[in-house]
Regions:
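Extended non-transmembrane interhelical loops and adjacent amphipathic helices
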Residues: 32-58
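Membrane-embedded alpha-helical segments of transport systems
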Residues: 40-45, 69-91, 246-258
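Membrane-interface alpha-helices at helix entry/exit sites of multi-pass transporters
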Residues: 29-30, 48, 62-76, 235-247
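Re-entrant/interfacial helical elements at transmembrane boundaries that shape
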Residues: 50-60, 215-232
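Transmembrane alpha-helix interface/packing and boundary motifs in multi-pass membrane proteins
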Residues: 41-43, 203-222
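Short amphipathic alpha-helical coupling elements at transmembrane boundaries
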Residues: 21-24, 54-58, 69, 151-158, ...
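Predominantly cytoplasmic-facing regulatory/coupling regions of multi-pass membrane proteins
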Residues: 1-35, 92-212, 251-273
Length: 273
């Protein structure tokens, strides 16, 4: 599990290394340190937005604000993968589980299907925007209140379609790694599920967690409830589901955050010197 955690965040470090390359060269080791530091800062901020601030500490001062925009592109690519995979999970969920009973007015899972349709439209729009990031720069140029900040977002228009596809590939690989971690923990703790069904339900869990705003340090409770709801449809081993969820949270978030805190202390000492 520790090795998979390192692979998970190593892929994220590679993404960030590619993203900031137009600004300055960052060795992979330094990118890895920046990612861990970002995790440590993010645990106390809504939806981990503090992650951006933790990473840019490793860059030159003149590049920090521009690097935030670059880092957001990386999060954007990960969100696309989360939504696409989550939609696959939602389709499986809707087709196999009638949670809201049908009535004379609504067909089975009517509202779930409405939600699925909305999510598909949103997914199509964000993918189109992802490959047309120049639109965001144009918005900053057209809106007076945003015009002064345009210089900080120009970097997102410098990524080629090839760069963006590479980011999506790395995001997909990372998604597969932390989904596999979850499945392995479930099996290790006696939660018996068909692997592909478990993967689809895990994808649905990640989709819900991406949509619902939360703070990382308080995320565990919500993650536990969502996991019990979806994985509980496949297995009655509730204790195993909770244990796997807590284990994944500790391995993929708490441990990197602790490492990041130590690294941030080193950055501060270096600056003091």
């Amino acid at each position: 599990m520790g090795i998979m955690m390192m692979v998970n965040w190593g892929l994220e470090a590679r993404k960030w290394q590619l993203l900031v390359r137009p600004l300055e060269y960052v060795p992979f080791k330094r990118a890895f340190m920046a990612v861990f530091s970002g995790v440590s800062v993010s645990v106390s901020t809504p939806n981990r937005v503090g992650e951006y601030g933790g990473r840019v500490l490793y860059l030159a001062n003149r590049h920090k604000l521009k690097a935030i925009a670059a880092t957001i592109v990386g999060s954007y690519s990960q969100l696309i993968v989360t939504i696409v995979m989550g939609l696959c999970g939602m389709i499986f969920y809707i087709n196999n589980f009638e949670i809201i009973k049908s009535s004379q007015y609504f067909a089975p899972n009517f509202w779930e299907k409405i939600l699925l349709g909305v999510l598909i439209m949103i997914c199509v729009l964000i993918i189109l925007l992802y490959f047309r990031l120049q639109i965001i720069v144009a918005i900053f140029d057209k809106v007076p209140i945003l015009r002064k900040a345009k210089i900080f977002v120009l970097i997102i228009a410098r990524y080629s379609a090839k760069d963006l596809r590479k980011l999506l590939l790395l995001s997909t690989l990372r998604y597969m790694v932390f989904s596999a971690q979850y499945l392995i923990l479930l099996y290790a703790l006696g939660v018996t599920v068909v692997w592909w069904q478990g993967f689809l339900m895990i994808s649905t869990i990640y989709l819900v967690m991406a949509i619902v705003p939360t703070i990382a340090i308080a995320e565990l409770g919500l993650r536990g409830q969502v996991s019990l709801y979806f994985l509980g449809l496949l297995s009655k081993n509730m204790a195993g589901i909770i244990a796997a969820t807590v284990g994944l949270w500790l391995i993929n978030l708490v441990l990197p955050a602790v490492i990041g805190c130590i690294l941030l202390l080193g950055v501060k000492i270096f600056k003091d010197k």
